[in-house]
Amino acid sequence: MTDILDDMIARADVAELFNLPMEYLGARVVKHDYKTKYPVKYLGNKNEDYPRKNWSSVVLWNCGYSPNRILTREKVAESTGSWLHRFSWLKDDQIGDLPSEWNHLTMEYEPRDDAKLYHYTVGTPCFPEYRVQEASDLWYATYRRAVSPIDTGC
């Protein structure tokens, strides 16, 4: 099996998010507030807790929001990953909520059938130690569709 490293599968149309009001917000995210159950994740990487953890994994940006104008190419290039991932230039009230079903963290949270986006943040089922987990069947089905020949009907 070829490893695929994508760790999210959307089960709904992300266009739904564009209907959310953004006028006074710099971004909308799922505001995860948790301590990881897994101090080590895929490939032996550290999985540390930090403020606003996993907030940056699904973001609806307001590109016209004036505080976001600080994000020039140069600023992004010189900034640390933690500064960027924590939205350090935005105050809490400048970051709105996305419904939690839009960034469901498998293995970290209790399973849910209404998840619109599964995020295999600890490890995708392509890694042996994560083969059996919530929604692994969905991951494998998506993988098979992605690597199978396209049926053009010709």
Question: Language-model features: where?
Answer:
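GT-A fold catalytic core of metal-dependent nucleotide-sugar glycosyltransferases
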Residues: M1-K37, L60-P67
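Generic detector of bulky aromatic hydrophobic side chains
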Residues: L5-M8, Y50, W139
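Short secondary-structure boundary/capping segments
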Residues: N19, Y50, E108-E110
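Catalytic phosphate/metal-binding cores of nucleic-acid and nucleotide-processing enzymes, i.e., regions
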Residues: L20-G26, P51-K53, Y143
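A glycosyltransferase accessory/donor-loop signature
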Residues: W55-C154
